[in-house]
């Protein structure tokens, strides 16, 4: 075979396309390319869609923001307008406190069709909704530094939307929230919901009319005007405080004394480690400044007639708490992770349990665990008696007797167990509701808790004030938190 010389000339051939029916080659090549691409798209997408076209799901519900699932996959919230490619499946609509709506749907072979559905959820557990919203509210009112990066949960707007077909629950939620409201931002949301449920013009900014409406609908005492003023934003508060109608009302309240009387019931049992405290009266005085130019404060008095009770003379010890754990394994240390998931404790629950001596006060417990301990202890008492956490007024009576070894403020860092869990969590100690004078009420679903540093009577400036308060969440399990029990008649 003859080898071709590498330097020989190679003749290049060039193919020239000719016009077809007068159409230039570059035009029909471009068109051919487009046709091929469209054919490919048709093969891969459009033709399958004719076999399984899908549809636009348009779903509305009587409750906004209902969660929609298709074949167990979350696809959005109502009002929903979303394209899906499923030909059939099980559609579910879920919302806390409502019965889950379920329906099997089938998409007919109609390309780019619509599938519209109106869902009406049935309310089955309003208390579950209320409990969750109260929990959120108690956390929201703790957030004081509001800025552009902080977005509060509009609790009142949410519950007004969720329970709009059941106004009695909304009205009760609003009223129950009053003692816990101490946030200008949340108060705005409160007023918006209040105006909506009581058919008041949202643009109505007449504070006197709003106050009188609140007072009438919620049966408030006149002294609740200070609760109202404290929740207004700074500028509006100053303006309203100086209004003639507020000054007139405040003058009638100075030195007003409301009596909160409970029928006394004699305690006829003795328990080891408990001290009997006789029935007595405790007077609380709260001062309010109406005008910064006026040196005179408005004083409100509340007199509590406290029933006879027994109180433990020391906090519950590790030894006592161990007995509780033996009979209640749910609260044992080896179940801590589950308790955290249920938000009943935090990671500090019984953290230093092994380091605590048997006769030392148990710490690292939460409000929830203390309540369960009290319920467990109640079962061991004679019929008609109940164990619970103390209320402030009971502590005051107990501490009237001076202690020989008061806790010095400089010793706090060395001491544990000086925070004592209390029964109630109200931010407001004044009696603000007419005809509702029960100050022994059980703690509600509100998740933040007011507790108090409880040492003994203040004798000089180096000692802690017995009524110093703090606010925290009920699942907190601080090494500084302890508790003791009260026993009283049921």
UniProtKB/Swiss-Prot annotation:
* Gene3D superfamilies from the UniProt entry: paralog of FGE (formylglycine-generating enzyme) (3.90.1580.10)
Q: What GO cellular component term, any one, is given?
A: membrane
Q: Name one Pfam family in it.
A: FGE-sulfatase
Localization, per the record, is: Membrane
Q: Which InterPro entries match?
A: CTDL_fold, PEGA, SUMF_dom, SUMF_sf
Residues crossing the lipid bilayer are: 27-47
Q: What is its main location?
A: membrane
Assigned keywords, A-Z: Membrane, Transmembrane, Transmembrane helix
Q: How does it sit in the membrane?
A: Single-pass membrane protein
List the protein's name.
Answer: Uncharacterized protein BB_0032
In its UniProt entry, the species of origin is given as: Borreliella burgdorferi (strain ATCC 35210 / DSM 4680 / CIP 102532 / B31)
The opening ranks of the lineage are: Bacteria, Pseudomonadati, Spirochaetota, Spirochaetia, Spirochaetales
């Amino acid at each position: 075979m003859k080898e071709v010389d590498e330097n020989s000339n190679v003749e290049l051939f060039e193919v020239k396309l000719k016009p077809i029916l007068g159409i230039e080659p570059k035009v029909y090549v471009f068109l051919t390319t487009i046709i091929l691409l469209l054919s490919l798209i048709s093969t891969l997408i459009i033709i399958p869609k004719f076999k399984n076209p899908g549809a636009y799901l348009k779903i509305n519900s009587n409750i906004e923001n209902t969660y929609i699932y298709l074949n167990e996959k979350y696809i959005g919230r109502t009002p929903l307008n979303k394209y899906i490619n499923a030909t059939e499946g099980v559609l579910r609509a879920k919302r806390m406190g409502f019965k889950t709506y379920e329906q099997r749907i089938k998409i007919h072979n109609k390309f780019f069709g619509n599938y519209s559905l109106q869902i009406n959820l049935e309310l089955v557990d309003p208390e579950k909704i209320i409990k969750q919203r109260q929990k959120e509210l108690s956390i929201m009112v703790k957030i004081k530094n509001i800025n552009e990066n902080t977005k509060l949960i509009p609790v009142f707007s949410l519950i007004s939307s969720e329970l709009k077909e059941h106004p009695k629950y909304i009205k009760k939620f609003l009223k129950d929230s009053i003692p816990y409201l101490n946030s200008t931002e949340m108060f705005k949301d409160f007023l918006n919901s209040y105006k909506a449920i009581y058919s008041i013009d949202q643009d109505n900014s007449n504070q006197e009319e709003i106050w009188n409406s609140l007072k009438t609908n919620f049966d408030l005492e006149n002294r609740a005007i200070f609760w109202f003023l404290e929740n207004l934003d700074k500028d509006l508060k100053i303006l309203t405080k100086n209004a003639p109608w507020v000054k007139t009302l405040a003058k009638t309240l100075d030195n007003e004394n409301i009596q909160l009387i409970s029928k006394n019931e004699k305690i006829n049992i003795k328990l080891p480690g408990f001290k009997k405290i006789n029935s007595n009266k405790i007077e609380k005085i709260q001062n309010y400044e109406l005008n910064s130019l006026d040196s005179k404060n408005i004083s409100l008095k509340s007199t509590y007639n406290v029933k006879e009770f027994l109180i433990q003379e020391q906090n519950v010890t590790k030894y006592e708490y161990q007995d509780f754990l033996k009979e209640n394994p749910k609260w044992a240390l080896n179940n801590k992770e589950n308790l955290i998931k249920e938000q009943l404790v935090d990671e500090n629950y019984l953290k230093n349990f092994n380091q605590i001596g048997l006769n030392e006060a148990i710490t690292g417990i939460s409000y929830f665990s203390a309540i369960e301990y009290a319920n467990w202890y109640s079962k061991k008492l004679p019929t008609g008696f109940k164990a619970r956490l103390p209320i402030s007024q009971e502590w005051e009576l107990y501490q009237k007797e001076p202690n020989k070894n008061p806790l010095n403020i400089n010793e706090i860092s060395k001491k544990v167990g000086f925070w004592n869990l209390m029964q109630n969590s109200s931010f407001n100690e004044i009696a603000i509701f007419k005809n509702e004078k029960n100050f022994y009420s059980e703690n509600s679903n509100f998740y933040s808790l007011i507790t108090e540093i409880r040492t003994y009577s203040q004798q000089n400036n180096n000692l802690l004030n017995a009524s110093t308060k703090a606010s925290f969440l009920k699942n907190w399990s601080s090494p500084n938190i302890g508790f003791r029990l009260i026993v009283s008649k049921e």
